[in-house]
């Protein structure tokens, strides 16, 4: 056995890469600090220091390098989350004293006194405050939330939620497979019927994907909390888990589509900046009964809500473009959401001219079906041409056969990116 010359041996220096925080780390830090801010007494130096540090982390999330993730859909979702949380902080932290403003409802009449909570309970109160989106069980429950399911046992509810969870994943896998089939012909040049088919696939695919972004956690969590009676007390009731989306039957106008049928996850934080700005107006304007002033307040709030929603979604495209070294872009998000608000204003004006008033009355058959046709046509066209196509192109997705195929590919990668699809895994094993 050869002898080793110990005197000539030198230790090998391990190469280490310097650790640096990316935007995902700063997003998480900003959230943790937001939960910590209400733990410090209001008006103290500690409170202001925590708040300043929280704001710094929130801003740094938009400036630091994005996570090293090549998946466009994941990057987009992380960017939307960043924008969503900033809007949430503006509403529940920056413009108010949260422990004095936001209270959980103990029963139908009694709000919880947050100032009397112990330190551990106040921490979990703050964690819930910055986590919930629709204010269910709080004194700020948003309007338009769909009614809770008909009375059923908690085990029936849990089973139904898990079934929806499975169907959701099956729908995502179906979107992926269908998009692959439609895109499999490299020479396809869609005719008008083909266009309609692709439009429908894009809109339905996006709808299922958006639904999954909320349901992926809410469905199993609700089944766990209600079925096993675990978690916060308010989460253990079936009534605490109403559907994310309302009935399609309500979508006989563009206003009702966005107000009742579509999800309400962003409604509170999207409307908060506009409500705050309106509150700064003189009392004479705030309380004026003049029709012109009331209409100006109403439609200003409407437009500002859609603009903020556009900004939140634009953060997603911003995150993708800077991560992949593409030209910075909002992907048309601002235009798309602003035009939704303008469409509602135009619709209201048209109803006023025609003498149509849907408030408090059930529409007639003609009104309902004409409304369905107009709303569906507007939504499908705008969802594809004003959002799907521009976002896909901004993300660097191109197809020589046309922009519709680029949007279709965006739908496919978005559906595939949703984690934990056990239905797709089982399908691959079987087939």
From Swiss-Prot:
Among InterPro entries, the record links this protein to: Wax_synthase, Wax_synthase_dom
Q: Name one Pfam family in it.
A: MBOAT_2
Pathways involved: Secondary metabolite biosynthesis; terpenoid biosynthesis
Top-rank taxon, per record: Eukaryota
> What terms describe the molecular function in GO for this protein?
O-acyltransferase activity
Glycosylation positions in this chain: 176
Can you tell me where the transmembrane regions are? 198-218, 301-321, 336-356, 404-424
Question: What EC identifiers does the entry list?
Answer: 2.-.-.-
Name where it mostly resides: membrane
User: Note on file?
Assistant: The macrophorins cluster contains a single gene insertion (encoding for the terpene cyclase macJ) compared with the yanuthone cluster that produces the linear compound yanuthone.
Q: What is this protein called?
A: O-Mevalon transferase macI
Lineage of the organism: Eukaryota, Fungi, Dikarya, Ascomycota, Pezizomycotina
Gene behind this protein: macI
